[in-house]
């Protein structure tokens, strides 16, 4: 394809290479290094004048270093007269951090006694959570990015932080496709969301496959702390847990144990973004999850085996890049019945 260049940071070279293979392109030549004091150095080793440039950089590993590489590469390409620069962020950096005031209080009071509200001593200082999501959006735009491509944002409202187009691709078609081809007797399965936040994602897959849906609800007003409640029936059925991200694996393992207690015969977990930090891999192996299926939006230390499987997202991102470069619609990428392999 004419005037199309794809670069990659050091965050996920294999994904960049795979995307370029599907596009029948060579990876753009760039030299990434660090000075002795740790500062990042970027040298674009080919002309990008008048080109449509895409830079692949998922948030993984040394997130801050890779984010800095991305920002400098975007700026370097714009300085070198690139026609357009698109940041391809399969895993969006800092998308898990909320932009809201920190609160010690938790749920609001349900009733008052004697019209007296007990108050803790006020120090005059109210801690705040930094607005990291807004900051990263501003950094990307200030560096010169014209377009953002990502997948399964942890909070879709992040799209509103940008003044440039943002295409939030869905991992649902890939997960649906995997379920229909690789899970035996999936027609007797129940799609389960481990929390209320992922209900919309899970119900979309359940509706596309014509399956029942269940939800694990956390009741934080329980007098003894947080309690779990299952909304739906998994008795003697295959439970398929759907989530957007797995990191420490505590949430997913706890959800798997909960549906097992409620009679699930077998448990699969399908997750878009897989980080698996610390001893998460061992935690999953020792859990009642029969198989964990993830995508390669981030580099994976696990290998496909009896306990794990990996879905390749490179064809999806390659097709998105091809369509955007050619000025075609990408709406077909949101169709649950369309999958690129």
UniProtKB/Swiss-Prot annotation:
Question: Known CDD domains for this protein?
Answer: PRTases_typeI (cd06223)
Q: Name one GO biological process term.
A: 5-phosphoribose 1-diphosphate biosynthetic process
Record has Metal-binding as a keyword:
yes
EC class name: transferase
Which superkingdom is the protein from? Eukaryota
PROSITE patterns, per database record: PRPP_SYNTHASE, PUR_PYR_PR_TRANSFER
Specify the pathway. Answer: Metabolic intermediate biosynthesis; 5-phospho-alpha-D-ribose 1-diphosphate biosynthesis; 5-phospho-alpha-D-ribose 1-diphosphate from D-ribose 5-phosphate (route I): step 1/1
Q: Where in or outside the cell?
A: Cytoplasm
The residues that hold Mg(2+) are 152, 154, 167
- What does this protein's UniProt record list under function? 5-phosphoribose 1-diphosphate synthase involved in nucleotide, histidine, and tryptophan biosynthesis. Active in heteromultimeric complexes with other 5-phosphoribose 1-diphosphate synthases.
Task: Tell me the protein's name.
Answer: Ribose-phosphate pyrophosphokinase 5
Taxonomic source organism: Schizosaccharomyces pombe (strain 972 / ATCC 24843) (Fission yeast)
């Amino acid at each position: 394809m004419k005037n199309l260049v794809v670069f990659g940071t050091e965050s996920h070279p294999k994904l960049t290479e795979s995307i370029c293979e599907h596009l029948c392109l060579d990876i753009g030549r760039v030299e990434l290094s660090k000075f002795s004091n740790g500062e990042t150095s970027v040298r674009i080793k080919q002309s990008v004048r008048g080109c449509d440039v895409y830079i692949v950089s998922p948030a993984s590993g040394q997130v801050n270093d890779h984010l800095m590489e991305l920002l400098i590469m975007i700026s370097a390409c714009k300085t070198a007269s690139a026609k357009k620069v698109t940041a391809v962020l399969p895993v969006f950096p800092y998308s898990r951090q909320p932009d809201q005031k920190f609160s010690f209080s938790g749920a609001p009071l349900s009733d008052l006694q004697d019209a007296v509200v007990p108050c803790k001593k006020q120090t005059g200082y109210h801690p705040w959570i930094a607005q990291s999501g807004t900051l990263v959006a501003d950094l990307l735009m200030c560096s010169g990015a014209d377009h953002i491509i990502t997948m399964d944002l942890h909070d879709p409202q992040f799209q509103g932080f940008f003044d440039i187009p943002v295409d939030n691709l869905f991992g649902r078609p890939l997960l649906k496709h995997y379920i229909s081809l690789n899970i035996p007797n999936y027609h007797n399965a129940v799609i389960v969301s481990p929390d209320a936040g992922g209900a919309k994602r899970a119900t979309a897959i359940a509706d596309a496959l014509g399956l029942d849906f269940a939800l694990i609800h956390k009741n934080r007003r329980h007098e003894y702390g947080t309690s779990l409640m299952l909304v739906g029936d998994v008795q003697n059925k295959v439970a398929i847990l759907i989530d957007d991200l797995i990191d420490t694996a505590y949430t997913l393992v706890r959800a798997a144990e909960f549906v097992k207690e409620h009679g699930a015969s077998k448990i699969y977990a399908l997750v878009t973004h897989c980080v698996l930090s610390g001893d998460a891999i061992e935690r999953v192996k020792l859990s009642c999850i029969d198989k964990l299926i993830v995508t390669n939006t981030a580099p994976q230390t696990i290998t496909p085996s009896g306990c794990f499987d990996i879905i390749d997202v490179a064809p999806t991102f390659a097709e998105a890049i091809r369509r955007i470069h050619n000025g075609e619609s990408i709406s077909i990428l949101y169709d649950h019945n369309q999958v690129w392999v």
